[in-house]
């Protein structure tokens, strides 16, 4: 049976843990609100850009349907961008990403895969399994600004345009709301694969020239997609962390209540024993006086 001192120490420890996990839960909630607002405000813009691109590409001539960011090519190397966290305490967030990644790899020839890992968990998994990691981005999601998204987008575009990879997929968590996040596998490059049968043989006069419109538009669409994915991933991670910390806080409170009950019970028993000793001593003294 634990001593009174041991129980007091345990109660103090659990009390400290309760304060810590509650603080982490509160911090995650603050971060979620900020990221959620940015993510949900960006989504309509991202969707509208995609609608514009789809409409524009349908109207392009053969010359511009061969744009390197639009045209499908023979696939020799497949790029895979994987978003995980750098920190723990986020429940099954990383586990679900890694499980999805394993299934994706199982459907591909691993020797033809090139990986871009965001977060230390993806990097550790890929390194331990000797996969080809092209670039590692550690603590990258600490900055979810558009300028940081552009840096990642340029790295990926450089490899695609220089034929280091022939297509690009991303595995990440799509942030739907604070209670729902889903793992997605999405093809990012080529941007819009359209077969020759699907195109419209129509010609338009573009002012300024079509190349001046198309190049920056395609670049903006890809950079915006990367930014959206970064925001969704960061918001989803915090949502998982908040839920994990909430469960940890609830469990810590249950343990605290249980230990406090044991402590009070032990103290009560100790006081009872002391009272019995005192009573017995008084009775003994009375007997001696007689």
Swiss-Prot record:
Record-given protein name: ATP synthase gamma chain
InterPro entries noted in UniProt: ATP_synth_F1_ATPase_gsu (IPR035968), ATP_synth_F1_gsu (IPR000131)
Species whose genome carries this gene: Dictyoglomus thermophilum (strain ATCC 35947 / DSM 3960 / H-6-12)
SUPFAM superfamilies: ATP synthase (F1-ATPase), gamma subunit (SSF52943)
Physiological role: Produces ATP from ADP in the presence of a proton gradient across the membrane. The gamma chain is believed to be important in regulating ATPase activity and the flow of protons through the CF(0) complex.
Superkingdom of origin organism: Bacteria
A GO CC term assigned to this protein in UniProt: proton-transporting ATP synthase complex
Protein family membership: Belongs to the ATPase gamma chain family.
Subunit structure: F-type ATPases have 2 components, CF(1) - the catalytic core - and CF(0) - the membrane proton channel. CF(1) has five subunits: alpha(3), beta(3), gamma(1), delta(1), epsilon(1). CF(0) has three main subunits: a, b and c.
Record-level Gene Ontology MF annotations: ATP binding; proton-transporting ATP synthase activity, rotational mechanism
A GO biological-process term: proton motive force-driven plasma membrane ATP synthesis
Compartment(s) where it occurs, according to its Swiss-Prot or TrEMBL record: Cell inner membrane
Key word Metal-binding present: no
Keywords assigned by UniProt, alphabetized: ATP synthesis, Cell inner membrane, Cell membrane, CF(1), Hydrogen ion transport, Ion transport, Membrane, Transport
Membrane disposition: Peripheral membrane protein
Pfam families documented for this protein: ATP-synt (PF00231)
